[in-house]
A protein has these predicted regions:
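C-terminal regions of proteins
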Residues: 48-131
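A short, structure-level motif marking secondary-structure boundaries and short turns
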Residues: 5-7, 36-38, 86-87
Length: 132
């Protein structure tokens, strides 16, 4: 859908909550990153994403759209095998997207290592369950 260059605003309610989230994160000193997960887009979806990109630019926010042919190739997503339906990745697709997102986050942000810290045991338990 990268050929779609027109924009369509999100619904009034969505825009209201978007603005509230932006305001709250700025007030709290939180860096907000807007990330669209991959799914099979309709033209209207891309128009809304174009509008979100414009709002993000206006507010100085990062908008990372993973719904582009180049990003699909980088993730090696196969629409015939990596989706459970038009809007949801299956387990294989989720693993590809999660790995891709993790690499991107690690490259663009710094996160403290919480391994072994009190209060983060559930993270380690989840990591052990996933076999990492």
């Amino acid at each position: 859908m990268s050929h779609v260059t027109t924009s369509q605003e999100m619904t009034e309610k969505s825009k209201e909550y978007f603005e509230k989230i932006v305001e709250l994160t700025k007030k709290e000193g939180i860096t907000l990153a807007l990330i669209s997960g991959p799914y099979l887009l309709e033209e209207r979806d891309q128009e809304v994403y174009n509008s979100i990109g414009q709002l993000a630019e206006k507010d100085g926010l990062l908008f990372w759209n993973t719904n582009t042919p180049a990003r699909y190739r980088e993730m090696a997503l196969d629409f015939s095998t990596d989706y459970a339906d038009h809007a949801h990745l299956n387990e294989a697709g989720s693993a590809k997207y999660t790995a891709y997102l993790g690499k991107w986050l690690s490259k663009n942000y710094s996160f403290p290592d919480r391994r072994g810290q009190k209060g983060y045991e559930s993270w380690e338990n989840q990591l052990m369950k996933s076999g990492e």
